[in-house]
């Protein structure tokens, strides 16, 4: 069996084969994420310095008291663009430093830069996966410029993008809400296992109520993604620990500000209202997509017929696990292919449109696969926590640490821990989970209702799902006793949800009370009096 990869899902895998020392330096400088195409809208290109002198200088500065020079040199070798051939070396192109690259000469297989006089040729042995916008070039001589005029690249919708992704403070309004909820959850778990008041349920319902009342188009976008586990829904909608990029599912301007949600509690009977949102899934008949070819209007199938979506997902599941090569190479690649089809065409087995256009646009660049793996992992950890005979704060803290530092949503591809084909490569990419256990978790994920997830009404949770085997979903039970041991996570999540009985009795309607609460929070009693007089 060959020991070297011939096709690459990551630039880091190629570096591991060619220069593990340089890869280690990049990793030690916390720059590994900069080599991922998921961080940039237009892919990424890495310039590998063939000259030992440059690599030695990087190493010397990296392990000095001030590694800033090494970081700057490495940034000059990273281009936030997909440039596979000399033909693409055109227009406004620059490095991660923000310095513009000026081309002096282009040949069939070579590019010579003016500033720095770098001579670049495409790496002959770097072939990325078809769905990865990655490229590697070899710098034969010269150097990449560290100083010079800046470059500006156009956004697709006009204006200019900054040369690097935005960096957001770790203590954002989203983070503060999450910390508040986590503290409340820990307290109520120690008191009564949150059987009376579940903070995750309260905030999830409140956010969805706010969107439904004030931003119906955003509500339409996120509704197919909600999860029966309020903890899962909370983290997927709020994305509180994301610190890079601006591709939030729900924009900042909607959540915060004078007319924003701002974490306001908006519910009367949290559990009943939460379940009602799932009932609405089959009633959203006004979310239409115009087919670009026929100009006909299509209702997204996640709304018109969610059961059929699950049926098609089950076909994909069966095809993957009945494949004659169920193994650590073929199986994860088939999973990636299924999600790639969904992201690129909004279809499952050519059946679609599955989601509203706004939803699928928000899930591109591997966010959908990241989300579904996140569902699987968060709920598994949550269920394990709830199944313990006694509650330990340290175990819940471990879940939060996992979300905050391993799965914040900064780099979707790099944060895939179960479904990424790269996780089944050599020993350097498998992390701290044994390969066999990881593969068992992958099979369990495929066999779960989290695979190609779309939300369904409560009454549809049982059905045929319950006839295929095990209903367990604790992380300790993830190794199936047989290949098709089915994990009905939706049913498992409902069981946890039904423990919460948050109810506030009042004669006013829910919508009226929610509007009043929001006015109280943001405009004061004078506005409430006006509202009541109307």
Curated annotation (Swiss-Prot):
Keyword Disulfide bond assigned to the entry: answer is yes
**Coiled-coil ranges from the UniProt annotation:** none
Residues of the site described as DNA-binding: 10, 39
Domain of life of the organism encoding this protein: Viruses
Instruction: Supply the alphabetized keyword list.
Output: Disulfide bond, Host cytoplasm, Ubl conjugation, Virion
- What is the protein name for this chain? Polyprotein pp62
Task: Say which family it is in.
Answer: Belongs to the asfivirus polyprotein pp62 family.
What are the annotated GO cellular component locations? host cell perinuclear region of cytoplasm; virion component
- In this chain, the site described as Cleavage is at 158-159, 463-464
Induction (record text) = Expressed in the late phase of the viral replicative cycle.
